[in-house]
Swiss-Prot record:
The name this protein goes by in its record: Protein U4
Lineage of origin: Viruses, Duplodnaviria, Heunggongvirae, Peploviricota, Herviviricetes
Superkingdom of this protein's organism: Viruses
Family note: Belongs to the herpesviridae U4 family.
């Protein structure tokens, strides 16, 4: 057998052995040409049997035809992507290219038809797409969460940049801010974060305005030896007609941006470049947000004064975050385009294979509609289309009998309680650990909310990669210690004035509504008749 060691076997080799879970005759599994396991099935409690319905891919993710070994590997990958409790330590998460290669390496039972093999791969990719590219504030190791954090951090940095500008009295500093457009400022006011505002952060005008004016801004804000040397070398290059261009094309190397800019030393630039090459700076940004520090230049002493130092720090971090956000957006767009092409080809194959059967016209129609949706150029709606595909896939796999991998998972758990099962595959070891924790009650089983009620789930959660859920209040407060070190009083004064302005506006609107209501009531008031008492005329008899 491929799931256990021979230390837990008893008796001779037998041609056929059937294991039946007590009080659950439908949960049975037959092993051929194997020894009997020395386990007591009565040790399984009703809670274990109920939780075992979430421990295999065929039960939780509705896959069919996989061998138990490959089913366990796929379950470990998808559970790690979907759950917040199960996180791999000191390991890089699987990317889309790695997952597509993993799908091609999956092994199926010999009796599995090509139709269900393609359907299983498409179903697994749909679950991976929703877990990786759907915005959720709880997830940390996905591209959508990394993009979400970058947008939140940019919102905070642009707000701090606006506050620093209001503290400037020098015309030179104010002229520098005129070169750098702030998307947080609209008509002189700071607006609350919204989807439309966050999309403006990634505008080419914003990015190139910050990048192309870097040398001019740094030469005015910092007078250290490195900046003076760089300024002199650039002057010599200009005389030699050597112009440095910073472009944002697809094959642009991150080291050209990092090593020549952002006021970093060679060692710091090397670490930042390695972080970008590893995971597009996800670990760097997450560490900065958890510790409430700036991603780079947090403890550096630079600039001519305290105010100029803060301006330069926020300015360099804005450039880095803009660069990373644009890189992550391009990666997400390319990945979703690959997913769309995969589903378009798979749906055509499934539609052709299902056409000869009768009574499936409605399913064929749904597959054709989904194929047209995946062939469209709206890549940001791919996770929603994957949810619709899972609804159709649940209909197609309903007639395919399961192989009761959950019984083998329970047997493996009983064997694991007796002996330590060793394996060279990390994913299999991870699957066994997670199953053990769930069956022993240390962790709750995973539940897929987007499968229970997909319409309500996608309506409540925003699926356009801009629905941030990590803001605390109106303005995010991510980098308070880096900017407000020496200017806390001025910042508090500014915030107090902003609050007073909002209070005065509310009071004015309240008074106007009161006056309007009073006027309406006066106009609708019906005048009453005036009653005047008259004395009766006195008749005198003459």
């Amino acid at each position: 057998m491929d799931l256990i060691d021979y230390d837990v076997c008893k008796g001779p080799l037998r041609n056929r052995i059937t294991y039946v879970i007590p009080n659950h005759p439908y949960l049975s599994w037959t092993a051929f040409n194997s020894c009997e396991l020395d386990v007591n099935l009565n040790e399984l409690t009703e809670e274990m049997i109920a939780d075992s319905g979430h421990l295999t891919s065929e039960d939780l993710f509705q896959t069919r035809g996989l061998k138990f070994y490959d089913d366990s590997l796929l379950w470990a990958v998808l559970v790690e992507k979907n759950s917040v409790s199960f996180k791999r330590r000191d390991k890089a998460t699987m990317t889309l290219d790695g997952f597509l290669a993993f799908l091609q390496s999956l092994r199926f039972e010999e009796c599995t038809s090509p139709f269900y093999r393609v359907l299983t791969k498409a179903t697994a990719l749909a679950h991976f797409t929703i877990a990786e590219y759907f915005v959720a504030g709880e997830k940390r190791d996905t591209l959508s969460s990394h993009f979400n954090r970058l947008m939140e951090l940019l919102d905070s940095l642009f707000l701090q940049f606006f506050m620093l500008r209001n503290r400037c009295d020098s015309n030179i500093l104010l002229s520098l801010f005129e070169l750098l457009p702030n998307p947080k400022e609209i008509a002189g006011e700071v607006v609350a974060p919204s989807n439309l505002l966050l999309k403006n952060f990634l505008d080419d005008k914003i990015f190139f305005s910050f990048v192309m004016n870097y040398h001019f801004v740094v030469s005015n804000l910092c007078s250290c030896g490195e900046c003076r040397k760089a300024l002199f070398s650039r002057f010599l290059k200009r005389r030699e007609r050597g112009v440095l261009h910073l472009s944002d094309i697809q094959d642009f190397s991150p080291q050209d941006l990092i090593l020549q800019q952002l006021h970093l030393t060679n060692d710091e630039a090397l670490r930042v470049r390695e972080s970008i090459d590893k995971d597009l700076g996800a670990e760097l940004i997450l560490k900065a947000m958890e510790s409430k520090t700036l991603p780079i230049l947090h403890d550096e002493i630079l600039g001519n004064s305290h105010l100029e130092r803060n301006i330069l720090k926020i300015y360099c971090n804005i450039i880095l975050c803009l660069f990373l956000a644009r890189r992550v957006r391009e990666r997400i767009s390319r990945d979703l385009d690959k997913i769309a092409r995969f589903f378009a080809q798979s749906l055509v194959f499934l539609e052709i294979r299902i056409l000869p059967f009768e009574g499936v016209e409605n399913v064929c129609r749904k597959l054709a509609v989904l194929g047209s949706h995946f062939s469209s150029h709206n890549v940001m709606s791919i996770p929603r289309h994957c949810s619709a595909f899972l609804e159709v896939a649940s209909i197609l796999v309903a007639s395919y009998s399961k192989q009761n991998h959950r019984v083998r998972a329970l047997l493996e758990h009983l064997c694991q309680k007796k002996v330590a099962l060793t394996c060279s595959c990390f994913l299999l070891h991870l699957a066994r650990e997670l199953r053990h924790d769930i069956l022993e009650g240390f962790t709750n089983p995973l539940k897929l909310h987007y499968m229970d009620n997909p319409v309500r789930f996608f309506r409540c959660q925003d699926c356009n990669l801009y629905g941030t859920h990590l803001w605390s209040g109106l303005f995010p407060n991510v980098v308070p210690h880096a900017v407000r070190g020496g200017g806390s009083f001025e910042v508090r004064i500014f915030e107090h004035r902003m609050r007073q302005r909002r209070v005065s506006v509310r009071k004015r609107l309240f008074k106007e509504s009161q006056h309007r209501g009073f006027t309406i009531r006066q106009s609708r008031r019906i005048p009453r008749l005036a009653f005047c008492p008259f004395a009766k005329p006195v008749h005198k008899d003459y």
